[in-house]
Amino acid sequence: MKTRLFSCLLTLALLLAAAPAVQAANMAYTDVPADHWAYADIANVTEAGLFQGVDATTFGVGQTMTRAQFVTALVRLFDWETVIPEMPTFSDCSDPNRWYYSAVETAYANGALPSYATSFRPLDPITREEMATMMVRALGYTSLAGRMSASQLPFNDVTTNQGYIAVAYDLGLVNGYASGQFKPDQAATREQAAAVLGRLYDKYSASSRQVSRAGYTLLTVPSPEATADTSIPTTPLEPFNDLYDALKAQRTAGTDMSQVAVVFTSGGIATTVQGSRIVSTETISQEEVEEYLDDADTHVFYSEAAQCAYLTSEGTGGRTVTVWYQNQEALEAKLLLCRLFGVNAYILQE
């Protein structure tokens, strides 16, 4: 039992961090000289297969990036399976023969586009605000953006989608200007979009690696204490929002993120409740978690907010046991967040 869960967690990093299957392309654009500020970015996204030139020899430097072009590159980056719905989602993107139709529908199906929108405006230039919003949505961080909507931004011109821009900025995907502005409504050029998506691609496709403690700045994120004033004791391992805040604090403090290792718990925290009283709270091993999971009467759940699995089990004498534990989905989500902050090292401990 222990071997099954332990092996799953140990091999996870090798599986989740694999780069999307993209085909390398030739970097032979006549409009991108080697001394161009975006040369490396354009080479990166071209070789990764995210971008194509406007023709065989021209990248299109200085041309605006359309919303359709950006969402197509985003779909390639995440390597999502193509989605073709029975009925089109957007009134202005309803022709299945359009080159961007499947990419728009695929992005929508994967949460990169808001569910309330009725039109997409595929041929409109994409703005800096829209790029940030689409990337954060694509990462599945809509709830996180909502939490960050009141964050203090270093920009004096952001009035809408503050949370999305805050997350994109915290993750190092977007920057502002020396004037203190973000210029959210400014249309992005193809090379600017290449730089932004290249940053996301590099972080998303990086590898997480399990390390020893020596030589690293260790980052631990404690679980909240169990209380009796909630429907169930809530003690998630490395709660997602707390992990985000801890990583952000390290980066803000100027820490070399490449030398940070996040410590994750491989077992779980079990809290026993009788009536409205907490009887006990203890850390348990992977083997003990597996024993609960093998019990047919155990109920299994997953908290999207905390990015942590939990189970409930009825004990003797009217007692209920709640266990928050590390599973593959939880560790995958947290390792990705770490990589987005530039942290690739982690420690998995009992």
Q: How does the language model describe each region?
A:
Residues 214-292:
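Substrate-binding surface in catalytic domains of secreted glycosidases
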Residues 46, 108-109, 169, 251, ...:
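Alpha-helix C-terminal capping/helix-coil junction sites
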Residues 334-350:
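Acidic/aromatic/glycine-rich contiguous surface patches that form carbohydrate-binding/processing clefts
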Residues 258-259, 263-334:
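Glycan-binding loop/region signatures in secreted carbohydrate-active enzymes
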Residues 5-11, 15-39, 47, 52-101, ...:
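Feature responds to low-complexity, polar/acidic, surface-exposed segments characteristic
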Residues 1-2:
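N-terminal secretory signal peptides that target proteins for export/translocation
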Residues 223-227, 326-339:
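Short, acidic/polar
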